[in-house]
Amino acid sequence: MTKEIQGIAASSGIAIAKAFRLENPELTVEKKSVTEVEAEVARLEAALEKSKSELEIIREHARKELGDDKAEIFEAHLLVLSDPELINPIKDKITNENVNAEHALDEVAAMFINMFESMDNEYMKERAADIRDVTKRVLAHLLGVNVSNPSLISEEVVIIAEDLTPSDTAQLNRKFVKGFTTDIGGRTSHSAIMARSMEIPAVVGTKTVMEDIQNGVLVIVDGLDGEVIVDPSEETVKAYEKKAAEYAEQKAEWAKLVNEKTVSADDHHVELAANIGTPEDVKGVLENGGEGVGLYRTEFLYMGREDLPTEEEQFTSYKTVLERMEGKPVVVRTLDIGGDKELPYLNLPKEMNPFLGFRAIRLCLEMQDMFRTQLRALLRASVYGNLKIMFPMIATVDEFRQAKAILLEEKAKLQQEGVQVSEDIEVGMMVEIPSSAVIADLFAKEVDFFSIGTNDLIQYTLAADRMNERVSYLYQPYNPAILRLVNMVIKAAHKEGKWVGMCGEMAGDEIAIPILLGLGLDEFSMSATSILKARSQIRQLSKADIEPHLDTILSMSSTEEVIEFVKSTFHIG
């Protein structure tokens, strides 16, 4: 009997295939007394080594298929396996209490997971998820249990799961896995982001697919509208095959725009750029018609290693990106470490709330040797392309002035050394803290440009952790408060003749695009795979026709009102 299940559209496309339930066995742990504690510690170490080997393989597969930025999460998992704060208490428990490795691991991991989950911030939630994923793998080795391996799937299927861990998602073979659907998760969960990178249709947050779908049943995953159809009729299958064909035709039409400029129906030009993490990501930017790089996340250069990258290593990476972009603008964000990104070799003290703590520009202004090394590398690379530099997490005008002063000092030093440096480097800032948006008029007199980081701006403005399912309903890109802040920033910048970009998820969202175009956003930076769809949409919109509706939109009192109005007025969905 056909059943329709509603979820969240996480990755566009239509998948029609038999269900494959990805079920991991219950890992039952019993407490046992042991006398040979050294042998038990050796068992633990062997399981840790096996897990490391597996994760290294998964990391390399993810790097090859998805790029360095998506593989970075497995660096975090490998760090968990080597973290003495986790591993030493497990060994101590085995030695001091004469208990088996499984019990010691389970007890210590549960303690850390509960501790991190009780703390109300995104970084700690992700830390708990990392520990859960990693310790489950180690526990399976200790128990001699085989955990499901998605990479072994050898027929066309739709995966059904309660959730997909990052390691599960990275192992999906796109040849056979046509789509997936999960009980939990949202558009910003790791599995959803990776699905979009891999272009695998996905519907998440359904709550009931594991309960409602058995192995082998035909399933349709509609990643366009967020629906899952179980055991569809022949007529329904034909209808969705037609929908899939229409979507494929639409994608083919978008592909024709790869070398076109992004111009609205009334001839207003905007720039569509891409967010990248490594030089390898440039290929995807160019293949999808990106007009620039709107966000180069430099922190990936610093991760998965035992010490800071040298000036020469950084110079080589920046130079490569600038050369490959062949004169198109490249906006580089200086080091944004802290919050959800740790560098163990810096030995920074633990913080109760790292997202509001010692991170990004705050860290760089104090650890100036590290900051100056990065700036020197960027300045040296500037002659190889169109470089723009921006500072993250700026809260006060004085912070921006300090950061820019250090940049100018390093520029002067290089020139004294006879090193050529571009004279056309624009220097801007991220707007991701509400205070920055509120005084954007003051910042606009200092900066060359703004880039609005909506992912953090939304969280900080609405005090809502987007990874916390209990409050994720408050993560609202179209909330009137967010739209008004964006409007304030754009108006303040344009008054001073400065340009404004946006590099959060919102920039590529089909509901946000008409509003942002009307407000006058100059640059939209998104995942490379979203560029052509966004270009097609903008070419059909008239900025002049949108502008009369802006006061109405900005005066609405809820997200729901905004979405309904935009959909009906601009014919979306």
From Swiss-Prot:
Homodimer. Mg(2+) binds at E432, D456. The gene is ptsI. This is Phosphoenolpyruvate-protein phosphotransferase. PANTHER family: PHOSPHOENOLPYRUVATE-PROTEIN PHOSPHOTRANSFERASE. The reaction takes place in three steps, mediated by a phosphocarrier histidine residue located on the surface of the central domain. The two first partial reactions are catalyzed at an active site located on the N-terminal domain, and the third partial reaction is catalyzed at an active site located on the C-terminal domain. For catalytic turnover, the central domain swivels from the concave surface of the N-terminal domain to that of the C-terminal domain. The N-terminal domain contains the HPr binding site, the central domain the pyrophosphate/phosphate carrier histidine, and the C-terminal domain the pyruvate binding site. Keywords: Cytoplasm, Kinase, Magnesium, Metal-binding, Phosphotransferase system, Sugar transport, Transferase, Transport. Gene3D superfamilies: Phosphoenolpyruvate-binding domains (3.20.20.60), Phosphohistidine domain (3.50.30.10), PtsI, HPr-binding domain (1.10.274.10). GO terms for cellular component: cytoplasm. GO terms for molecular function: kinase activity; metal ion binding; phosphoenolpyruvate-protein phosphotransferase activity. Belongs to the PEP-utilizing enzyme family. It is found in: Cytoplasm.
